[in-house]
Amino acid sequence: MNAERLMQVILAPIVTEKATFVAEKNQQVAFRVVADATKPEIKAAVELLFKVQVESVQVLNRKGKVKRFGRFVGRRRNERKAYVALKDGQEIDFAEVK
């Protein structure tokens, strides 16, 4: 896989209450990824960026909600999430990533 493509696959870590609970319980980290990212690409990107070993990747697509803004109807964007399970002894510290 192209290293340039792998650098663009992961958009941002997801730091929510649910994602933190999953991280503590299942040793998984949640990321927002591009819409056309595949599981092997996500695995390779996490291993390249964070220098950790990935055990598995679970992906979900979330459809954007329709929201009203006064009399105008708008829509939030669709989102693709990846839950990355790390091998035993591996950990990602977002404070040290450059």
Swiss-Prot record:
Keyword DNA-binding: no
Keywords assigned: Ribonucleoprotein, Ribosomal protein, RNA-binding, rRNA-binding
GO cellular component, one term: ribonucleoprotein complex
GO biological process, any: translation
Pfam families reported for this sequence: Ribosomal_L23 (PF00276)
Residues forming coiled coils: none
Database matches in HAMAP family: Ribosomal_uL23_B
Subunit (UniProt): Part of the 50S ribosomal subunit. Contacts protein L29, and trigger factor when it is bound to the ribosome.
Similarity remark: Belongs to the universal ribosomal protein uL23 family.
Protein name: Large ribosomal subunit protein uL23
Organism from which the protein derives: Bordetella pertussis (strain Tohama I / ATCC BAA-589 / NCTC 13251)
Lineage start: Bacteria, Pseudomonadati, Pseudomonadota, Betaproteobacteria, Burkholderiales
